[in-house]
Amino acid sequence: MIRIFALITALAITVKCQDDRRPFYVIGHMVNSIPQVSQFLELGTNAIESDVEFSENGTALRTFHGLPCDCLRRCKESADIVDYFQYIRNVTGFRHSEYSEKLLLVFLDLKVSKLPPESKYAAGVDIATKLVLHLWDGVPFYDAMNVLLSIGRASDMAVLTGAIDTIIGFDPSLSLFNHVGFDVGLNDKLENIAKMYERLGVNGHRWQGDGITNCLVNLRSPLRLKETISYRDTNKRESYVDKVYYWTVDKVATIRKTIRRGVDAIITNRPKRVTGVLEEDEFKKTVRPATYRDDPWMRLQSKTTGRGNELDSDMDEMGDEASEFDFEPFSYPLSPRRPLSSRSPAIRDSYNVWPQYNPLSPFY
């Protein structure tokens, strides 16, 4: 009887202590040089977005955005793609790596829409090969970096096909797909993106964004963002969206408004502003920064505040646009990663099914 009472008490404490706030991803925008990785992480990001430039034949060359880019940003920062992946592997991939618990997701904006059609499959093959050989190779399974492969348009589907086929070729066990997600980033119609995923046989790990450059984001209609959130929050067959993000958001008023809508992530040039808003009384009871314990592919439905449906006709005030990037780096406390307690379907097999895996069993 005493043992039963103790067990019931322990279960009650576990349920009571469970944190049901939405895990939120603060994605640093245009992190295209190696020094910028640590800069953005020290400023509060838990994910980074990088732009990948390809040669005409589909070879991934470097991280680079170029002109034009966001207001008040330098557009020409870059790094060799292999050096970039190896750096991230070194600072995240092992138990006592400097950012092993801080950097949760690398969002790769694959600049492939202008490639010749015959080069798009090759681009997927090449970026996946470089990920396997230079980011994931030799890294323990639970420490492997999560990567979001973002193409511009649904018409770029061949890139994802090439990447998927290549990863399967390297890893017939399909375990690496637990660390891979997908996105279509340039505001295509959602129904077209849904059809693309159906053709690919992908039914999990799908992020979906909406937005525009920070120079114009305050003029953008919220209708597509609302539609994207509704895709996540319904269970219809075409409702493919697992995570919703908005880009590129720098002003505090717009950050607040976007979080009220129930997004899972914001891409920003000003991460300290986003983390500051997350600490405000209105939000800190319902939203929190994501940690390594959170599954970046898990779908969570909206819990908007009472102000979540307010009118959007008001324009955001001009905030302080002083740079946040003049600072002295400081050391971050280190502690080992631990495995996630559960995992959602992650792997496409040859029958276009993404099987469930037992989270208690090793994947390697």
UniProtKB/Swiss-Prot annotation:
Keywords: Cytolysis, Dermonecrotic toxin, Disulfide bond, Hemolysis, Lipid degradation, Lipid metabolism, Lyase, Magnesium, Metal-binding, Secreted, Signal, Toxin, Zymogen. It comes from the Eukaryota. Expressed in salivary glands. It catalyses: an N-(acyl)-sphingosylphosphocholine = an N-(acyl)-sphingosyl-1,3-cyclic phosphate + choline; an N-(acyl)-sphingosylphosphoethanolamine = an N-(acyl)-sphingosyl-1,3-cyclic phosphate + ethanolamine; a 1-acyl-sn-glycero-3-phosphocholine = a 1-acyl-sn-glycero-2,3-cyclic phosphate + choline; a 1-acyl-sn-glycero-3-phosphoethanolamine = a 1-acyl-sn-glycero-2,3-cyclic phosphate + ethanolamine. SUPFAM superfamilies: PLC-like phosphodiesterases. GO terms for biological process: killing of cells of another organism; lipid catabolic process. The active site is at residues 29, 65. Its cofactor is Mg(2+). It is an enzyme of class 4 (lyase). It is found in: Secreted. This is Dermonecrotic toxin SPH. It comes from Ixodes scapularis.
